[in-house]
Amino acid sequence: SSHFEPPQYPSNGPLPLVSVQHGTTARKSDAPSQPGSGDIWASVFASYGYAVVVADYLGLGSSPGYQAYCHAPSEATSVVDALRAGKSLCASNNVTLNGQLFLTGYSQGGHVTMAAHRELETLHTNEFTVTASAPCAGPYDLGGVTIQSLLSDPAYPNPWYFPILLAA
């Protein structure tokens, strides 16, 4: 499942498409497709005239099971599927896209952005061309820096994070 944010004002021409990857969330109900979850960055991009998609990652939203936290293949697939759905929705509503595709994400979304960018450029070049990508503050080194940080501070401020990491 995913969330689509249409531009917030009438367009004078074709629109760029941006895929916003959300940060780490511990609850299925906080996934972008769920009512009231809202993604501020999706709204910001839409207010500037972008068509916006925000993917739920597998295990979040309405999908069964646990989230495969920082599992690059499943994260990338979620983004590709959301992009396809967004393009299809635009086409069926007479919204023309201009061919520009932007990817961005923060926290887990940074990791997802890197995974999606790699997949788009290696497996989907006939379908998508990434214009620019901004993966921000992602957990890129789970086996090193992230684990070291979790274990070195006895007062780790996010105790909910460790079970997500172990379950993944």
Where are these regions (language model features)?
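A conserved short beta-strand
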Residues: 126-138
